UniProtKB/Swiss-Prot annotation:
The gene is rplD. Belongs to the universal ribosomal protein uL4 family. GO terms for molecular function: rRNA binding; structural constituent of ribosome. Keywords: Ribonucleoprotein, Ribosomal protein, RNA-binding, rRNA-binding. GO terms for biological process: translation. This is Large ribosomal subunit protein uL4.
C-alpha cells in the first residue's frame, strides 16, 4: 500500500498517510488517455493555409483553352502555380478535442497520485504559506526537498503564497479543485497541504 510522507515545518518526516488501496489497482492506460485528451485540448490550432477560394486573383483564364500547344489552365491560383493555393493544407477551424469520461478522468488522477507516492515524490504538510510573499522563501522549500520541480497543492490559494511561487519556473501552485492527472504526472514532485489531500481523496 502506498504511503505519503508527512513533513513538519523543517521538512522532516514525522508520519505517514495511506492512500486508498484501490488506487494501486488502476490501469496506466487511463492516464495515457487523459494526458492525450488534455494536450489535444490546449493545442493552439494556429496552422492555416489558403485554398483556391481564399487566394486573391486568378479569376481570369490565363490563356485560351486550345491552339497554344501548352497545357490548359483555368486559373493562376491552383496549387501547381507559384503564388497559388495549397492543396489539402491545414485549416484553423479543426477541433482537436478528445472526449474522456468523468470516471476515466478520476481513474487517471488516482493512478498519477499513486505513482508519485510509490516513487516517494509526494509530500504532505500542514500548511504551505509564504506570508512574506518573497520568491527566495518559496525557493527554499524546493531546495530543502531536493527536487527538480514541484506542483504545490493548497486547500485555498492566498495572494502572498501565489506571488512568492509565481516567479519560479520550476513550480506551479494550484488549489485542490484544480488538480488533474496531467499536472500531477508532469512535475517530478508534489507537495500538498493535508486538507487539500483529504479533499482530493474524498472526491473519489
Amino acid at each position: 500500500m502506498s504511503k505519503i510522507a508527512v513533513l513538519n515545518e523543517k521538512f522532516e518526516k514525522t508520519s505517514e498517510i495511506e492512500l486508498p488501496a484501490s488506487y494501486a489497482e488502476v490501469n496506466s492506460h487511463n492516464l495515457y488517455l487523459y494526458v492525450k485528451s488534455y494536450l489535444a485540448g490546449i493545442r493552439a490550432n494556429s496552422a492555416h493555409t489558403k485554398g483556391r477560394s481564399d487566394v486573391s486573383g486568378g479569376g481570369k483564364k490565363p490563356w485560351r483553352q486550345k491552339g497554344r500547344g501548352g497545357a490548359r489552365a483555368g486559373s493562376t491560383r491552383t496549387n501547381v502555380w507559384v503564388g497559388g493555393a495549397v492543396a489539402f493544407g491545414p485549416k484553423n477551424n479543426r477541433n482537436y478535442d478528445q472526449k474522456v469520461n468523468k470516471k476515466q478522468k478520476r481513474l487517471a488522477l488516482e493512478f498519477a497520485l499513486n505513482d508519485k507516492v510509490a516513487n516517494g515524490k509526494f509530500f504532505a504538510v500542514d500548511s504551505i504559506e509564504i506570508s512574506s510573499g518573497k520568491t527566495k522563501d518559496a525557493a527554499s522549500i524546493i531546495n530543502k526537498l531536493g527536487v527538480r520541480d514541484a506542483l504545490i497543492i493548497k486547500n485555498e490559494l492566498d495572494a502572498k503564497t501565489l506571488l512568492a511561487f509565481r516567479n519560479l519556473a520550476n513550480c506551479y501552485v494550484i488549489d485542490a479543485s484544480e488538480v488533474n492527472a496531467y499536472l500531477v504526472s508532469v512535475y517530478s514532485a508534489v507537495i500538498a497541504e493535508k486538507a487539500a489531500l483529504q479533499s482530493i481523496v474524498k472526491e473519489g
